[in-house]
Amino acid sequence: MPPQASVANPRFAFDGIRAQIRDLHTESIADLAIRARELGDVIPLWYGEGDMVTPPFIREAAKAALDEGQTFYIPNMHGYGPLNEALAGYQTRLHGRDIPVSRTTVTPGGMQALFMALELLVDTGTNVVYVAPQWPNIHNAIHLVGGEPRPFSLDFDGDWKLDLDGLFAACDARTRAIFLSTPSNPTGWTASREEMLALLEFSRRTGIWIISDEVYGRLYFDAPVAPSILQIAEDGDRVLSVNSFSKAWAMTGWRIGWLTHPSAVAGQIGAMTQLMNSGTSGSVQAGATAAILEGEPLVEEIRRRIRTGLDLAYGALAQIPGMVLPTKPRGGMYAFFAVEGEADARKVCADILEKARVGLAPGYLFGSKANAFLRMCVCRERGQIETALGRMLAMRN
C-alpha cells in the first residue's frame, strides 16, 4: 500500500493523477494584476471583456424565468426549446443556410462548447493544428483532452496573413482537426470566404475536421457577420462551430454558448452534455433567448464601441515613437501592437503599468510569434480609453 498523502509528505498527493492534469498550467497576468491592486487607479485593459453591464431586457427575461419557477433541469440536453428555436432561426438568417434545431447544442459557456468539440474528436496520440497567435486556453484544452497541440503561426509583415499551403502541410495522418479563431483573439485577423472554401475543400479531401471559433464573428466591421464556415458547409461536412453570448451581447459572466455541429453527431453531443454538465441553467437560457430575439441593437452598439476604441487607440499609438501598428483589424475587440527593439513585451507591460497605470496583456500569452506584442481591449467606454491612451502618451513622449 502506498504511503498516505499528508501535509508533511505532499509528494504522494500527486500519485495517480493523469499526466495531462499533473502537467497542466495556465499562463496569466496574475503577477501584473497583483501589482495593479497594490498601485490602485489602474485602468484594466488586459482582459477580453467589455465594461458594459448586461442590459435590462436580458436580465429581466432571466428573472422572469426564475419567478415562474424555472429552477429545474432542462430535460433536453441540447437546450431550452425556445432558445434552440431562436438559435436555429438566427443562424439560418445570418448565414443564409438552413441550420435546423438538430445542429445546435447549448453549452455553459463557449469554452465548454470548445471542450466538447475536442472531446468528440481527439484521442491520445492524435493532434490538432491550430492557427496562432491564439488564446492560451486553446493550447491547454487540446493538451487536456490528450492531444498534441500543434501551433501554426500567421505570417506578419505589417499585416497578419495565413499561409494555407503551410497550414495544410503541418497536418499529418494523426491530425484530427484544424482549429482557427476568426476574427482572432488577439490579432483580429479574419479568414476570408476564399480561405474558408479552401479549408472546407481540404477537410472534404482528407477527412480532417474544421473547428471554427466564431465567438467574435458579430464584432466584425465590414458586414453584419464575419465570413463563416457555416455559410458554405453542408450538414454532412466535418465542421464544428464554437460560439458564445459573452462578447457580442455583454454576457461574459452568464457562462452560456453553443456548438453548431452535424446532425449526425447530435446524439453523441447530447450524451456528452448529460455526462459533462447535465445542461445549462434554464434561467440563463431564458436570458440568452431574449438576447437573440431582441439583441440586434445591442450587438450594433457594442460593435460601434469597439470601432471607436480602435480608432482612438490607433490615433494615439501612432504618435508614440517606436510603436509597431499592424493594419487595423477588421474584427475582434483588441488593438495588438509592438514596440520596436523589444523582443519580450512583459517588461513593456510592467513599465506601462508602473508609470501609466494602464494594464495591458503581454503577447507571450498567445504564443512565441507574439512575444513582442501587447494586447489592449478597446471594448470600453470612450472616456476610459481616452484616459488610458493619454497616460501612455504622457509616459512615452
Stretches with model-predicted labels:
Residues 2-4, 89, 168, 342-343, ...:
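PLP-dependent enzyme catalytic core of the Aspartate aminotransferase-like
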Residues 126, 147, 205-208, 237:
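A short helix->loop->beta-strand "cap" motif at the edges of active sites that frequently abuts
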Residues 103, 120-142:
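Conserved PLP-anchoring active-site segment centered on the Schiff-base-forming lysine
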